Structure formats: C-alpha cells, structure tokens
Amino acid sequence: MVSLCIKDNNTKIQDFLMKKIGESNIPDIYYSKHIFKLYENVIIHYKGKDFQKFYKFLSNLLSDAIINYYEPTIVKRLILKDYFYFDALDRNSIYNEYNILHHNSKKYINKDILDYIENHKSIVLNGFVNFRLSNYKNSLEPLVESAVSKFVLDKEYLEFVSLLRGYVDSKIPEPIKIHLIYSNKESILLDENYNMLEFEDFNSEYLSDISFSQNDYALNTLIGKLPESIYIHLISPKDEYIETLELIFGKRI
C-alpha cells in the first residue's frame, strides 16, 4: 500500500481534491479529510498494484489544483510587480487577456509533482508552489508579456478608432454615396454610379517610409471624402477591418 497526505488550508482546494478523487475510476483508492495541527489534510491510500497509474492520477490532480487555485494569484502578482505603472483597471484587463491566451502550463508542473510524490508521503501544497515550481512560474512570465502587448495594442487601436470617429462626427458629410467591395481582405471603392474610385494618398512626408495596405488607403479615402452613405458589399466574411469601419463611420454605413 502507498499513501499520500496533501496539506493545504484552502477549503476550495480541499473540496476540489475530494470531489475529483471520488469521481476517479481507479479501484482500491481510499481517502479521507482530517485536521492535524496547522493544516487540513486530504489523506489518500492506494492498495492496488498499478502504482504508475496512481501517481500519474495524483500528479494530474495536483497540477489541476495548482492551475485553478494558485495560478491566478501568481499571475496577478507578476503583473503587479512588473507592470505596477498600470492602474488597477488596466491590470485587470491584462489578466483577462492572459486568460484568453492558449497555453499549457500543466506540462511544467506534472513532472516536478510526479518526482516529488513518488519519493515523499506528504506534500504541503502552498510550500511546494512557492519553492519547487520555478520552471512553471518562469513559464508564465512570457505569457504575461504577451498579454500586456495585446492589451497595449488593443488600447492604442481603440484610441485610434475614437480619434477618427470624433473627426468624422465633427464634419458635415458630403452628399455622395460610396460602395466598398470587400474580398480576400482587400477593398475596392466605387462611386454611386459604380465607377471605380482611385485611392487618396497619405500626404505627409513623415509617413513616406511606412508601407500601407490597400485597406489603409481605402480608409484614408473614405475619411477624405466623408460620404453621407457607405454601402459595404461583402464577398468575404466580415472581419476586424469591416468592424473598424463600422465603428468609425457609424450610421453612415
């Protein structure tokens, strides 16, 4: 028989462990919860013979517990430590961006836990996270950096759209109609008689070294002409560019 005592005082973690152990399909597992001195303990006994399967189950279980209940705090501390100059609302937005990112932090935890529980009869979960999972915590830092980059780009994008929307709303529209044909992420502009319109150039010496896409020129032309109505004809599905036009020109579309 092999046994493991999992020590942690987080009630949610205790309940999570008890629930998942109870749902396991591994025979010959016996478990209970007791309070001894400083910690609440989940005690697991295994009387079977497939030790590899048992330890693999435990390492997966503890990895899930760490990701679900410890990782949010670790990530928020990383954001606060490295990006303290953002206010609380922005830091929360960065954390939300982090949660959207696809990542597999579990692979950085499993082996360390497996190596430990195969050689120890008890594990203090909080101490293990704080002192034995450096590879795992290091793996979170580039993900936080990616979340910050995404947040900054999104914020700049919203500020850009807001600026253009303010400019468009401040101008009296011209009594013309323009059709925009959108296909394969490229735009074609037609006047109300369906004649092709030439794109207006970016008239600034400071932008001479920047490479603009066809859609950039189309947007610049629409802003320059300020039509009262824009008809969008989608050959390809709507994407972020079309959504940007809708945000900038509003009811004119």
Task: Outline where the language-model segments fall.
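C-terminal structured domains
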Residues: N193-I253
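Conserved mixed alpha/beta catalytic, RNA-binding, or beta-rich assembly cores of soluble enzyme
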Residues: M1-D216
